[in-house]
Amino acid sequence: MTKPPIGGNRTGRKLGQKVKKGKLKASSRRWLERHINDPYVQRAKLEGYRARAAFKLLEIDEKHNILKGARRIIDLGAAPGSWSQIAANVTGSTDSDIRVAAIDFLEMTQLPGVKILQLDFLDPQAPALLMEAVGGVPDVVISDMAAPTTGHQKTDHIRTMHLCEVAAYFAVEVLAEGGHFLAKTFQGGTEKDLLNMLKQNFKQVIHIKPASSRQESVEMFLLAKGFKGRRSGNALGHEVEDDGPMPHDPREDATADEDQD
């Protein structure tokens, strides 16, 4: 499902193209060449996804079965919207029955079946607005949030891990029992306190680096499966429609003991 085309792509464009020097800086030219020759970029265009990141989510789902049966999904750091496209398709979300809420401080072009909030997720109002937008208790919270890079690896790691941590605590506050949480992190280790919190609240916690992540990238994904539920209801303190526990996928049993952290 997520393997890139071999020896080219199905659009007829050959890979390995060079970009003329012109007025571009060497670093910009290298980035552009890498982008136009990336088979996942080509495939995203062919299959109608807004970004190559779609294949990261599809690849993770193919192995770990986190989307099947999901009735409502919240997408954090959603721009340009490829994960939201997948979420809308999985949930059957429509403009008349919204089941996907997406948030990003960057502007996003509208997507059918997706309620988009142009807002920083760290805004204190964001959690309540997301829950209002999604129309009920989500089965899955996905986050592709990353802080703007500074070029200093330790600083970038700390800033992105803060976003991951905030997203994780939000997921624990809002997820349906049996739900799943997926978030971007960086190589260099997830903070012990965050891992311990997730292990207390989910049945399985693993790190993943999908093949569709660029080889030179330090990004990884933190997946927490099987939310155990809250003892005292929704921690955000407002009424939402509860569809009950997320339907169990028997395929999860086959991977329950894999790659435990």
UniProtKB/Swiss-Prot annotation:
GO molecular function list: rRNA (uridine-2'-O-)-methyltransferase activity
Functional summary from the UniProt entry: Specifically methylates the uridine in position 2552 of 23S rRNA at the 2'-O position of the ribose in the fully assembled 50S ribosomal subunit.
Pfam families with a match to the protein in the record: FtsJ
One Gene Ontology term, aspect cellular component: cytoplasm
Name of the protein this chain belongs to: Ribosomal RNA large subunit methyltransferase E
Binding residues annotated for S-adenosyl-L-methionine, in chain numbering: 81, 83, 104, 120, 144
PANTHER family: RIBOSOMAL RNA METHYLTRANSFERASE (PTHR10920), RRNA METHYLTRANSFERASE 2, MITOCHONDRIAL (PTHR10920:SF18)
Catalytic activity: uridine(2552) in 23S rRNA + S-adenosyl-L-methionine = 2'-O-methyluridine(2552) in 23S rRNA + S-adenosyl-L-homocysteine + H(+)
Keywords: Cytoplasm, Methyltransferase, rRNA processing, S-adenosyl-L-methionine, Transferase
Residue segments, region Disordered: 233-261
Active-site residues per Swiss-Prot or TrEMBL entry: 184
Enzyme Commission code(s) on record: 2.1.1.166
Locations listed in the record: Cytoplasm
Similarity comment text for this entry: Belongs to the class I-like SAM-binding methyltransferase superfamily. RNA methyltransferase RlmE family.
Skewed-composition ranges (Basic and acidic residues): 245-254
Lineage of producing organism: Bacteria, Pseudomonadati, Pseudomonadota, Alphaproteobacteria, Hyphomicrobiales
Entries under Gene3D superfamilies matching the protein: Vaccinia Virus protein VP39
Principal localisation: cytoplasm
InterPro entries in alphabetical order: RNA_methyltr_RlmE, RNA_MeTrfase_FtsJ_dom, rRNA-MeTfrase_E, SAM-dependent_MTases_sf
Enzyme class: transferase
Keyword field contains Repeat: no
